[in-house]
């Protein structure tokens, strides 16, 4: 499940309620959005952190990847509209950055596993002994 705009709560003021318990019951995973860090492997599968790629360059995304690798964490990247940097919007995942990113993660010497969220979550659930 992808939380709309990363929001895990509904309502306002005193009536605000988390719908994470509903997501936990109905879905194998729930992904937030625009978080600043990657996921520890001892995590809440109903609230997976997702780091935003919008308006980022390859150098900053690569730094996030390397940090997650060094820490033994799972990095989920997310973005919105994909296009060229000439498009002026706050929610643009730059296609040139994506091309660099894809070249980097496809290179076998970098040893980066990419897969759908559900596949990686299943692997962690089976193999994480914590």
Residue map of PLM features:
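Catalytic domains of cell-wall/extracellular-matrix polysaccharide-remodeling enzymes
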Residues: 1-62, 97
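C-terminal domain-boundary segment and adjacent tail
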Residues: 27-43, 62-69, 76-130
């Amino acid at each position: 499940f992808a939380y709309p705009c990363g929001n895990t709560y509904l309502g306002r003021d005193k009536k605000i309620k988390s719908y994470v318990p509903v997501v936990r019951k109905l879905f194998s995973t729930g992904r937030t959005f625009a978080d600043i860090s990657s996921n520890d492997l001892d995590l809440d599968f109903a609230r997976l952190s997702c780091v935003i790629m919008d308006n980022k360059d390859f150098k900053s995304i690569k730094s996030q990847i390397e940090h997650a690798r060094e820490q033994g964490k799972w990095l989920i990247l997310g973005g919105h509209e994909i296009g060229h940097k000439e498009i002026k919007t706050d929610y643009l995942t730059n296609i040139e950055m994506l091309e660099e990113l894809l070249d980097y993660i496809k290179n076998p010497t970098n040893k980066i596993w990419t897969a759908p969220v559900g596949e990686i979550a299943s692997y962690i659930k089976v193999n994480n002994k914590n």
